[in-house]
C-alpha cells in the first residue's frame, strides 16, 4: 500500500505567532518559557494538521525557533569561540547570539554569516569549520521533540540536515580545514550517537536531508558520502534510514546514492524530473523505498494532479507500489499555510492557489489514486484539470497587449555593443568590475552606532 509523508512544514504560525513570540523574547518583554510554549503549541498544531489531512509519516524536528541549520550546529556543538560557550548544552541565549549577534558590555560578537539556501529565498546560518574542531551532542531539541510527538500519538519521522551536506554547507575558517575530511568524520561520530538515541526511542524512519547531492559532486566527494553512510548505517538499529534530496535531480550521483546502505531514497520529481529517467535507466534497488516528491513544495500553485499521477504511475513501473511514499518535492517551509484565507485577491486567481494545507490534500489524493485507482479520485482530478486549463488560458496570465509590445521590441534593431559601451560608460561611470551589497551587514555595536548617527 502506498503511504504519504511530508518533508517539513511552515514554522512561523498561521498568524505569525512565532515571529511575535521571538520578538517579545528578544525585547525582554517575555521569558524563555513563554517562547517555548509558543513553539510547543505550533508544533502540535502542525502535527495535528498533517495527521488530520491523512499524512502517514509526519516530520519532527523540522520546526525551528530560527533556522534548521542553526539547530544542526547546536546539535553537534559547533559553536564558535567568540560566543564564549564552554561545551554545555546550547541555551537560548547562545543559540540566538549565533543567529543575531550579541552586544553587551562584556561581549560584542557578530552573528554567523547568512546565505541563501540553495536557489530559494530562504537564508540559513553558515556553520564555521576550524582545524582540530571537536564535536559532541550539545542539544536535546531533536530528542525532546520526538518524545513530544510520540506522546501525542504522532507517527514521528525525525528530520535532520544530513552530515554530508552540513559539512559542505559550512565555511572553512582556514586553508587547513577539509570539510569532507576531519569535519565530516567528526559529524558522523555525533550523528551516530543521535541515531542510536532515536532508534532507542522507537522511531520507524529517520530522514537525513542531503540536498548537496543535486549539485555536481566529484568522485572523491561521493567516496566520502559512501564512507559516511557506511558508518551511520551501523547506528540505525531497527529504524529505517532515509536519504532525502530536493531542489533538482541527482545526476551522476544517482548510482552512488542508490547503493548506500540505507532503507529509502527521496527524489525530487518536480524540479528534478530527470530523476525519473535515472530510475528507468538504472533501476531502483530491491528492498528500498522511494519517496517520490511530486507536489511542488516551492510554489503557491495547485498541482495538475492528472499530470502528477502520470509521473507516479511511471515511477511505479520501476518501484513496486508498496515501496512508494508520495510526498512534496521539498519541505513546505517555503509556502504559506492556507490559501482559503486569501480574501483580498481575485476569485479566479484564488482558485489556482495551493498553500501548505492544500498541498497536504494533494499528496493524500495522489496516494489514494495509486491505492484505489483514478476512479476513486475522479472529482479531484477533474477539478485540478479545470483549474490548470483556466490558468493556462486566463488573461491574468496571458496579456495580449504585453505580447504585442514585446514582439515589437524583439523586432527593433538593437545598437551594436561597440556603440552601447561608450554611452553606458558616460552615463553610469562604472568601473570594469562594479560591486554592490545585498543590504545585510553584521550587527555589531559599532555598526549599530554608525547607522544610528547617520539617521539625522
Regions picked out by a protein language model, each given a short descriptive name:
Residues 1-456:
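Domain-level signal for soluble alpha/beta catalytic cores
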Amino acid at each position: 500500500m502506498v503511504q504519504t509523508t511530508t518533508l517539513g512544514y511552515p514554522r512561523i504560525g498561521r498568524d505569525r505567532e512565532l515571529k511575535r513570540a521571538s520578538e517579545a523574547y528578544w525585547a525582554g518583554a517575555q521569558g524563555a518559557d513563554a517562547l517555548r510554549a509558543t513553539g510547543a503549541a505550533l508544533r502540535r498544531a502542525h502535527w495535528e494538521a498533517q495527521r488530520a489531512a491523512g499524512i502517514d509519516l509526519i516530520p519532527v524536528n523540522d520546526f525551528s525557533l530560527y533556522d534548521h541549520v542553526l539547530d544542526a550546529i547546536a546539535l553537534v556543538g559547533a559553536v564558535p569561540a567568540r560566543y564564549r560557550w564552554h561545551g554545555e548544552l546550547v541555551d537560548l541565549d547562545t543559540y540566538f547570539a549565533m543567529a543575531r549577534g550579541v552586544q553587551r558590555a562584556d561581549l560584542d560578537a557578530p552573528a554567523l554569516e547568512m546565505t541563501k539556501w540553495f536557489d530559494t529565498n530562504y537564508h540559513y546560518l553558515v556553520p564555521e569549520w576550524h582545524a582540530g574542531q571537536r564535536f559532541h551532542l550539545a542539544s536535546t531539541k531533536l530528542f525532546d521533540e520526538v518524545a513530544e510527538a510520540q506522546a501525542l500519538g504522532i507517527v514521528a519521522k525525525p528530520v535532520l540536515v544530513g552530515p554530508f551536506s552540513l559539512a559542505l554547507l559550512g565555511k572553512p575558517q582556514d586553508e587547513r580545514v577539509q570539510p569532507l575530511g576531519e569535519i565530516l568524520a567528526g559529524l558522523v561520530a555525533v550523528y551516530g550517537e543521535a541515531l542510536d538515541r532515536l532508534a532507542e526511542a522507537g522511531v520507524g524512519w529517520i530522514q537525513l536531508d542531503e540536498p548537496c547531492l543535486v549539485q555536481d559532486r566529484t568522485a572523491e566527494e561521493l567516496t566520502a558520502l559512501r564512507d559516511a553512510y557506511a558508518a551511520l548505517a551501523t547506528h540505525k538499529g531497527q529504524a529505517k534510514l532515509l536519504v532525502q534530496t530536493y531542489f533538482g535531480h541527482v545526476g551522476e550521483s544517482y548510482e552512488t546514492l542508490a547503493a548506500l546502505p540505507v532503507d529509502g531514497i527521496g527524489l525530487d520529481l518536480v524540479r528534478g524530473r530527470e530523476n525519473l529517467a535515472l530510475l528507468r535507466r538504472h533501476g531502483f534497488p530491491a528492498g528500498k523505498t522511494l519517496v517520490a516528491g511530486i507536489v511542488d513544495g516551492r510554489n503557491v500553485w495547485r498541482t495538475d494532479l492528472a499530470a502528477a499521477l502520470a509521473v507516479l504511475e511511471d515511477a511505479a513501473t520501476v518501484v513496486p507500489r508498496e515501496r512508494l511514499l508520495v510526498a512534496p518535492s521539498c519541505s513546505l517551509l517555503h509556502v504559506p499555510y492556507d490559501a482559503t484565507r486569501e480574501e483580498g485577491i481575485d476569485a479566479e486567481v484564488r482558485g489556482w492557489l495551493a498553500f501548505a494545507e492544500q498541498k497536504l490534500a494533494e499528496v493524500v489524493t495522489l496516494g489514494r489514486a495509486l491505492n484505489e485507482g483514478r476512479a476513486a479520485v475522479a472529482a479531484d482530478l477533474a477539478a485540478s484539470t479545470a483549474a490548470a486549463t483556466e490558468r493556462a488560458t486566463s488573461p491574468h496570465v496571458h496579456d495580449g497587449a504585453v505580447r504585442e509590445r514585446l514582439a515589437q521590441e524583439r523586432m527593433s534593431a538593437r545598437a551594436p555593443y561597440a556603440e552601447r559601451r561608450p554611452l553606458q560608460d558616460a552615463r553610469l561611470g562604472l568601473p570594469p568590475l562594479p560591486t554592490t551589497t545585498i543590504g545585510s551587514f553584521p550587527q555589531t555595536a559599532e555598526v549599530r552606532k554608525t547607522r544610528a548617527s547617520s539617521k539625522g
